[in-house]
């Protein structure tokens, strides 16, 4: 009886986590539906890094790189809000996200999210002078 209860509890928890993950991916799609995200592009990419569920499978070195990238995204968002552009730091972030999006230990869906984020940042790099703030 206890074993059945324990298994049932684990299954319910797993379904709950799966539903929450699905909601996050749906919410992410909604966030990027129109152009309002542009003023907060670095903040949104950082949120994506915070929610990547498969990062725990990555190597310590990869997790440290992702943490450093989160910090750089915060810096870039602050600079953007001040009207400043830092191409060097942006290139570092793009390189880091590119490496992460190619890491086989991350789930394919999480790699797709990182690849999409990389494309958004490359678009910003190319058009930052005309980017909506």
PLM regions with names:
Residues 20-133:
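Glycine- and aromatic-enriched low-complexity segments, predominantly in secreted/extracellular proteins
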Residues 1-22:
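Classical secretory targeting signals
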């Amino acid at each position: 009886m206890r074993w059945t209860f324990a298994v049932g509890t684990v299954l319910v928890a797993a379904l709950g986590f799966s539903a929450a993950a699905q909601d996050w991916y749906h919410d992410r799609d909604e966030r990027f539906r129109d152009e309002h995200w542009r003023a907060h592009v670095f903040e949104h990419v950082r949120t994506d890094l915070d929610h990547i569920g498969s990062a725990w499978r990555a190597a310590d070195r990869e997790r440290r790189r992702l943490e450093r990238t989160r910090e750089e995204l915060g810096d870039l968002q602050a600079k953007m809000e001040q009207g400043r552009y830092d191409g060097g730091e942006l290139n570092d972030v793009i390189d880091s996200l590119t490496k992460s999006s190619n890491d086989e230990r991350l789930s394919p869906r999480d790699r797709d999210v990182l690849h999409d984020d990389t494309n958004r940042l490359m678009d910003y790099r190319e058009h930052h002078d005309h980017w909506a703030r």
